[in-house]
UniProtKB/Swiss-Prot annotation:
Pfam family, one: LRR_1
Cellular component per GO, a single term: collagen-containing extracellular matrix
Gene3D superfamilies: Ribonuclease Inhibitor (3.80.10.10)
Family statement drawn from the similarity comment of this UniProt entry: Belongs to the small leucine-rich proteoglycan (SLRP) family. SLRP class V subfamily.
Gene encoding the protein: Podnl1
Reported modifications of this chain: N-glycosylated.
Keywords from the UniProt entry: Extracellular matrix, Glycoprotein, Leucine-rich repeat, Repeat, Secreted, Signal
Disulfide bond entries: none
Protein name as catalogued: Podocan-like protein 1
Annotated compartments: Secreted, Extracellular space, Extracellular matrix
Signal sequence bounds: 1-20
Tissue: Detected in bone where it is expressed in osteoblasts and newly formed bone matrix (at protein level). Also expressed weakly in osteoclasts (at protein level). Expressed strongly in calvaria, lung and femur, and weakly in kidney.
Glycosylation sites: N64
Lineage top rank: taxon: Eukaryota
Length: 559
């Protein structure tokens, strides 16, 4: 090297070093500061592999998306189509979210997916697709095409996907003709399939054997073909409610092979009997709103693990549940019989039953032993039946020592039942014909927190002295819509909410609430109060009071 060239090289090196250390030019020598991350306009890129363009009202696919993107969010925009060139170059995508756009099938090029050979999560729900993509990548794990207008699926839409676990197709327009027999061929680990709210007329054949959750509610299904559910031994939840199933559309083997089934919903169909072949693993059986008139014990004898049996709104009459029908159900926790035509409590209730819910029936009597077998009952609802005090045995409730909630609203009771258990927390007796309250009727209820006596015929003079004495835990007392002329005296000290609306109260004296220092809410609307009917001293000691309702009285009341 010639001396002149060497001198020039040394001068250049010196200049470079000087400017590298110059604080005025930190970007020239500071390698710790990364170059600006490429990101589409208005979008955010919180990480090198994430591009978030959600909710920007975009009408065209954004440009300048880095090839390094693994997660692309475009949901909640106005996109109608995806350009093949832009999408196909993003070959490293793992997640593509197109939820809630205006994308049509014509605007979603099948060819683009051939390049997305690492795509795992594909969300295109709430768009305008009329057919599914003919091909989706083999790498797919989750596919959500719900809430479109899809009428046809293709063999390679969901077939040959060894990693696919969840498919969502609910709220489309699928008929059975739009599902090829090999829809899920080669996809052997699918655990969740949602086909609800379509137009299927029978249960599709060749469903994946790996299924754990199958949603078929809100279709037109009238039949489950024989063997359609013979391989789904992992199925835990099956939803068939709101269809058109009849007894002839099921047979003894329909559910018998489902050896893992825990939840079966057949409500809102046209079944006249309980289905045969129920598996022993079943925990919840929902048969509400069918046409069932009779329950045969043999139909339940294998379902020994059943904990919740829901039979509300059927046509169960006086002999619908003969003695012994429920005996095999030793684990039964809850029995729903709401809205039938039962005239008595079912005999021989399971001993571990904790909730018996049967309002809106025709029950007219309660005998001494009607509930004796269900000593574990914690909730008993017999509201809106035809119970009269004369036909409720004094010992009907006496042995229910775990009972916490008793609802007898809407019956024909003229007095409180005798023998109420001390364990009660809630007692509902509204809309009866109660005329008297005596201390003996509420004796021992020192755990009661809520007492509803609304819509009866109670007068203050018919409430015996000391009636409230033992209700030491009472927080809520509803005496609305009775015939009270003033606030009942000596109310429970723990009381926090007092409902006295729609009575005949015309005056509230200074001593009215001396016994209730913890009162938080007081309702006196629609009485006979005038401007100065409430003495100022009446409310002075109520430091916790937050609500005083005196509307709809003859005059505006000063409080």
């Amino acid at each position: 090297m010639r001396p002149q060239e060497l001198l020039l090289l040394l001068l250049m090196l010196k200049w470079s070093l000087a400017h590298t250390e110059d604080p005025a030019f930190p970007h020239l020598g500071d390698s710790s500061q990364p170059l600006p991350r490429p990101c589409p306009w208005r979008c955010s890129c919180p990480r090198d592999d994430t591009v978030d363009c959600a909710g920007l009202d975009l009408r065209i696919f954004p440009d300048n998306i880095t090839r390094a993107a693994r997660h692309l969010s475009l949901q909640n925009n106005q996109l109608r189509e995806l350009p093949y060139n832009e999408l196909s170059r993003l070959s490293g995508l793992r997640t593509l979210d197109l939820h809630s756009n205006l994308i049509t099938s014509e605007g979603l090029p099948d060819e683009a997916f051939e390049s997305l050979n690492q795509l795992e999560n594909f969300y295109v729900a709430h768009n305008k697709l009329s057919v599914a993509p003919q091909f989706l990548p083999r790498s797919l794990r989750v596919a959500d095409l719900a809430a479109n207008e899809v009428v046809e699926i293709f063999p390679l839409t969901f077939g040959e996907k060894p990693a696919l676990r969840s498919v969502y197709l609910h709220n489309n327009r699928l008929r059975n003709t739009g599902l090829p027999p090999n829809t899920f061929h080669g996809s052997e680990v699918i655990t969740t399939l949602s086909l609800s709210s379509n137009q299927l007329s029978y249960l599709p054949p060749s469903l994946p054997a790996s299924l754990e959750r199958l949603h078929l509610q809100n279709n037109l299904i009238s039949k489950v073909p024989r063997g359609a559910l013979s391989l789904q031994t992992h199925l835990r939840e099956l939803y068939l409610q709101h269809n058109q199933l009849t007894d002839s559309g099921l047979d003894a083997t329909t559910f018998s092979k489902l050896s893992s089934l825990e939840y079966l919903d057949l409500s809102h169909n046209q079944l006249a009997t309980v289905p045969e072949g129920l598996p022993g693993t079943l925990t919840i059986l929902h048969l509400g709103r069918n046409c069932i008139r009779h329950v045969e014990a043999v139909r339940l004898h294998k379902a020994r693990g059943l904990r919740y049996l829901l039979l509300q709104h059927n046509k169960l009459g006086a002999s619908a549940l003969p003695k012994g029908t429920l005996r095999p159900l030793r684990a039964l926790h809850t029995l729903h019989l709401y809205g039938n035509k039962l005239e008595r409590v079912p005999p021989a209730l399971p001993r571990h039953l904790q909730a018996l819910v049967m309002p809106h029936n025709h029950v007219a009597a309660l005998g001494a032993r009607d509930l004796v077998s269900a000593r574990a009952l914690a909730e008993l609802n017999l509201a809106y039946n035809s119970l009269a005090s004369a036909h409720v045995h004094p010992s009907a409730f006496r042995r229910l020592r775990a009972l916490r909630s008793l609802d007898l609203a809407g019956n024909q009771l003229t007095r409180l039942p005798e023998g109420l258990p001390a364990s009660l927390r809630s007692l509902r007796l509204q809309r009866n014909q109660l005329r008297t309250l005596e201390p003996e009727q509420l004796a021992g209820l020192n755990k009661l927190r809520e007492l509803n006596l609304a819509h009866n015929r109670l007068r203050v003079g018919d409430i015996g002295p000391g009636t409230w004495h033992e209700l030491q835990a009472l927080k809520v007392l509803d005496l609305s819509h009775n015939e009270l002329s003033f606030v009942p005296p000596d109310l429970p000290e723990a009381l926090e909410e007092l409902y006295l609306q729609a009575n005949r109260i015309s005056h509230v004296g200074p001593e009215a609430f001396l016994s209730t220092p913890h009162l938080r809410a007081l309702f006196l609307r629609a009485n006979r109060l005038h401007m100065t009917s409430i003495r100022a001293e009446a409310l002075q000691g109520l430091t916790h009071l937050r609500v005083v309702d005196t509307a709809e009285n003859p005059e505006q009341v000063l409080v």
